[in-house]
Amino acid sequence: MQQATGNELLGILDLDNDIDFETAYQMLSSNFDDQMSAHIHENTFSATSPPLLTHELGIIPNVATVQPSHVETIPADNQTHHAPLHTHAHYLNHNPHQPSMGFDQALGLKLSPSSSGLLSTNESNAIEQFLDNLISQDMMSSNASMNSESHLHIRSPKKQHRYTELNQRYPETHPHSNTGELPTNTADVPTEFTTREGPHQPIGNDHYNPPPFSVPEIRIPDSDIPANIEDDPVKVRKWKHVQMEKIRRINTKEAFERLIKSVRTPPKENGKRIPKHILLTCVMNDIKSIRSANEALQHILDDS
């Protein structure tokens, strides 16, 4: 008998409950003696009935086969640990014509799916696959209904607060809102706002019609390259860079002057030049005045 089996038998006795070893040994020996007379002439060690130690105590020793030679070679000093196994070894070998069967083999026959009611591998795999498919279908059906409501919960608190604030400042337009709507039919539009190009275009020639915004492309022809550097690619590249920067600055200055002419600016004092930051402030004030005028016009349309 292996030493591991002795340790497991010590666990059987449950020494943590303050039961001394001699009392537990007597209890175990008397139990084996009582059961021996009832099962000695029966073929109890078979696939339908487990060994006495497994049947009565509900434990499975970790041994493959118990042979008489193992019990005979046990030293005398280890008798306290292996004394209960002598009776068990005699019980296992009571039938000389029956081959010895180990605990592992008997356990395998005992725990077979047909005898213990356990599911086979194919049955357990089929049930697992069915449950996985059922869960995946439920998740797909629930995600479709939760997408429209869960976007606010996914956002962090800061983003959610910002989203709520934007909705309050710029509410969505609904078909039943009180906001006045522009007529969609061209017959309802007044004739003074109808032209050949389409509705909402005043007829007067004095209305503002800005040209499309475009950034001019700067090109320097090769004919403008000086003759003394045209053979040196490095100098040609530097010269083109300088010329392009000059043209870009001139174009920026002209565009700024056109912008300043289109806004109201304070008069010059003593012929001095007005600083650019003051001119840009005038541009911002005009933009704000345009926005205020649009809001006032919107209120007039809402009240009408």
Swiss-Prot record:
Q: Which terms in the GO cellular component ontology are assigned?
A: nucleus; RNA polymerase II transcription regulator complex
- This protein's source sits in the domain of life called Eukaryota
Q: Which parts of the chain are coiled coil? A: none
In this protein, which residues make up the domain named bHLH? 236-290
- What is the protein's given name? Protein INO2
Q: How does it assemble?
A: Efficient DNA binding requires dimerization with another bHLH protein.
Which source organism does the UniProt entry give? Saccharomyces cerevisiae (strain ATCC 204508 / S288c)
Please provide the Gene Ontology terms (biological process) for this protein.
Answer: phospholipid biosynthetic process; positive regulation of transcription by RNA polymerase II
Could you list this entry's UniProt keywords, alphabetically sorted.
Activator, DNA-binding, Lipid biosynthesis, Lipid metabolism, Nucleus, Phospholipid biosynthesis, Phospholipid metabolism, Transcription, Transcription regulation
The miscellaneous annotation reads: Present with 784 molecules/cell in log phase SD medium.
**Disulfide-linked positions:** none
**Which InterPro entries does the protein's record reference?**
bHLH_dom, HLH_DNA-bd_sf
Q: Which PROSITE patterns match?
A: BHLH
Q: Which Pfam families match?
A: bHLH_INO2
Function description:
Positive regulatory factor required for depression of the coregulated phospholipid biosynthetic enzymes. Also involved in the expression of ITR1.
Q: Where in the cell is it found?
A: Nucleus
UniProt GO molecular function: DNA binding; protein dimerization activity
| Record has Cell membrane as a keyword | no
